[in-house]
Amino acid sequence: MIPVSEAQQKLQDLIDAVNQSHQPIAIAGQGNNAVLLSEADWASIQETLYLL
């Protein structure tokens, strides 16, 4: 998990990383957390959920 301040500074690099590795990156915010993943991986998850 990386802090939101680091994610802001490295956003393009993180976008490139999740697209290349297909591994999501957890981001720690102030009180809330989030996950960054590629659009292709998100679409795949949505398709899987639809089929269930």
Model-derived regions, located:
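Extended, alpha-helix-rich binding/interface surfaces that flank or overlap catalytic cores
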Residues: 1
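The conserved cystathionine-beta-synthase
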Residues: 4-20
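Short, charge-rich, low-complexity interaction segments located
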Residues: 24-52
